[in-house]
């Protein structure tokens, strides 16, 4: 009977304690990404321009950009070659430019992943020569615009 009284006291204390420390911070803020894919077919080079506006998060975003399921070994980000996912701070880096040469001619499937510890968004884009496509979607308070434009 004593254990029952102890259990009752413990449950009462648990229910009456202030749970403000367990509140989850709202990360559904208004953020706009303007993303332009410029496809240059003469030299088979693709350029990605990623611009971020109104970014209020407290941490960096990680950008992964893959073609046909693999990271290109010729991926150049802001003038530097890299094989790792790109991490950047949108408060400082308002834009990022990537250039790389796809190993496969014709249609290329591009997998784009934007993520931090609070969200992750992944999309697959099929890009073909002489084609212009725009993708618009909202996710967790984010507005993300992706436009593919044929290179000149």
For each of these PLM feature ranges, what is it?
Residues 121-131:
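C-terminal edge beta-strand
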Residues 100-104:
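Residue-level recognition of secondary-structure-to-loop junctions
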Residues 19-76, 80-81, 130-144, 149-151:
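Acidic/polar, low-complexity intrinsically disordered N-terminal segments immediately downstream
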Residues 114-118:
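Surface-exposed loop/turn motifs at beta-strand-loop junctions within extracellular Ig-like
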Residues 1-4:
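Positively charged n-region of N-terminal signal peptides that target proteins for export
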Residues 94, 106-110:
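Exposed beta-strand face motif in extracellular beta-rich ectodomains
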